Structure formats: C-alpha cells, structure tokens
C-alpha cells in the first residue's frame, strides 16, 4: 500500500490520506477485523484504497470484502479484460465481466447440522435472489454496454438446475433486455 500512495503522491494526486486498518492486523491490534473507525472513514470519504485482506478459511471472522459490499451496497463487480500482449495464448480478448456482489450465495447464510455426536457433520448454505436486485444488476450491465459501445450482453446463469434461484435472474434479464433496442441478450 505504501508504494501506491508514494506513486500517487509523486504524481501530484490531490489526496489527504486517512490511514485505517482492516483484516488480521486490525483484529490483532484493535480487536476487530473491521473497526468502526474504518467504516466511518469509508462512509465519510466515499473512497477506499484497499489491498488484499485475509479471510480465514473455514472458521474465523466473516469476509471483510463481503461485509464491505453489503455495508456500502457495492452490488456490481466490474472486471474489464483485454488482450495486452499480441501473440499470446488468446488473441483479441475484449470482454467485461459484471458480477452481482451481494445476493445469491454471497448472502453467506451458512450453517452446520449435528448428526449424532458430530456437531459439524453436515454443512449447508442458502442463497437468495430478489427480483429487484436481479433487475438492478442486469440494468447496470445494459447501461454499461450502452455507455461503452458494446453490442451484446451475455447473461450467465444456472437456471437449468437452479430453476427458481437462478431462474429469477434469467427472467429479469429477459425483461430488461426488451427495453434496450439494438443490444442483444445472449444467455448461457
């Protein structure tokens, strides 16, 4: 993180840095993986320069990334991808992945079920998708396509297996697509 702030400072970027902690370091020094001061700083400034945060696998505190997404309604994860080096394994790659960040299995409703003497014999998780959130993320993708001169939106789903949970996403995708003449919807 220090390298990034040094470069931005050298470029004359007009930032006043408000350094806050999160993750394992914050847990050890402040007793919370995501201290109130960090959340207050994010809410106040509306900006975060965040590096990777460790999330314990299997046990421990809830993912800070998931908490931040839900706390600040960071519902759209936008990942542009383009071929940079010609002659590589893949040529002419130019796509943008827009992933919904707060519903589905990201709701993180997980539990153990006891069987006999084993309190963790069965692990299960549940997800949910709301019509409103499905509509919002699909609309975001279509608006992104319009603003960036894209010709199509590909909706990736599992409605063949998760007929209700993923089906509502596909249904809303089709409804929103009907409003965008000139853009095609492909679903897989």
How should these model regions be labeled?
Residues 9-14, 175-183:
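Short helix-capping segments at alpha-helix termini
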Residues 14-35:
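N-terminal beta-loop-helix "entrance" segment that forms/cooperates
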Residues 26, 56-57, 160-164:
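Short, small-residue-enriched loops and turns at beta-alpha junctions
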Residues 28-124:
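N-terminal glycine-rich phosphate/adenylate-binding segment common to multiple enzyme folds
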Residues 163-173:
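Short glycine/threonine-rich loop-to-helix capping motif typified by GTGT followed
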Residues 186-188:
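Conserved small/polar residues in nucleotide/adenosyl-binding loops
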């Amino acid at each position: 993180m220090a390298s990034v702030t040094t470069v931005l400072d050298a470029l004359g970027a007009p930032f006043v840095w408000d350094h806050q902690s999160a993750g394992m370091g914050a847990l050890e020094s402040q007793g919370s993986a995501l201290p109130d001061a960090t959340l207050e700083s994010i809410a106040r400034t509306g900006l975060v320069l965040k590096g990777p945060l460790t999330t314990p696998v299997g046990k421990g505190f809830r993912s800070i990334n998931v908490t931040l997404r839900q706390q600040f309604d960071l519902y759209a994860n936008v990942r542009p991808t383009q071929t940079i080096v010609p002659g590589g394994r893949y040529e002419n790659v130019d796509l943008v992945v827009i992933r919904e960040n707060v519903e589905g299995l990201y709701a993180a409703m997980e539990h153990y079920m006891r069987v006999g003497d084993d309190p963790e014999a069965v692990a299960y998780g549940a997800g949910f998708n709301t019509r409103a959130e499905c509509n919002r993320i699909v609309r975001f993708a279509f608006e992104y396509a319009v603003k960036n001169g894209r010709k199509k939106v590909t909706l990736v789903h599992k409605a063949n297996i998760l007929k209700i949970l993923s089906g509502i996403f596909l249904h809303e995708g089709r409804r929103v697509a009907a409003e965008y003449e000139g853009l095609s919807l492909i679903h897989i």
